[in-house]
Amino acid sequence: MFRGATLVNLDSKGRLSVPTRYREQLLENAAGQMVCTIDIHHPCLLLYPLPEWEIIEQKLSRLSSTNPVERRVQRLLLGHASECQMDGAGRLLIAPVLRQHAGLTKEVMLVGQFNKFELWDETTWHQQVKEDIDAEQLATGDLSERLQDLSL
């Protein structure tokens, strides 16, 4: 399980260094093999260990290629999916087209989200967090049943 937000830097070749606390788990569970794709709702990337991505692919394969909405989701997620292998120094090379989609340049937020990571431009991440907090403060109590059961 991945959790927390960590600031990492992209080097001049577009590689990011995976924080040490995740490396062993990624090597053990995925042999360092990852898949990166775009998030279709936010200006960030989704980074999955290969076994987790394969579950997503199975779900995508069950969508209808004749339904325009389902086909669009398949096209966006699969069409942008890029395999990346963690190197011996614990770095992942993020494809240029993916970096461009998320506006990633130097400072990147690696955000744990249970079975995957989100990759955000640092400034965009902080703006999104502020927007999310503001939206929660303005919320009128329209919580889903699952959120109503969440006690913090």
Curated annotation (Swiss-Prot):
Domain of life (superkingdom) = Bacteria
- What's any one GO cellular component for it? cytoplasm
User: What is a GO molecular function of this protein?
Assistant: DNA-binding transcription factor activity
Q: Does the keyword Metal-binding apply?
A: no
UniProt record, GO biological process: negative regulation of DNA-templated transcription initiation
- Name all SpoVT-AbrB domain ranges: 5-52, 81-124
Q: Which UniProt keywords apply?
A: Cytoplasm, DNA-binding, Repeat, Repressor, Transcription, Transcription regulation
Kindly report the protein's main subcellular placement as a broad class: cytoplasm
Q: Where in the cell is it found?
A: Cytoplasm, Nucleoid
Q: What does this protein do?
A: Negatively regulates its own expression and that of the subsequent genes in the proximal part of the division and cell wall (dcw) gene cluster. Acts by binding directly to DNA. May also regulate the expression of genes outside the dcw cluster.
Against HAMAP family, the record matches this protein to: MraZ
Q: Which family does it belong to?
A: Belongs to the MraZ family.
Quaternary form?
Forms oligomers.
Name it.
Answer: Transcriptional regulator MraZ
Q: What is the lineage of its organism?
A: Bacteria, Pseudomonadati, Pseudomonadota, Gammaproteobacteria, Enterobacterales
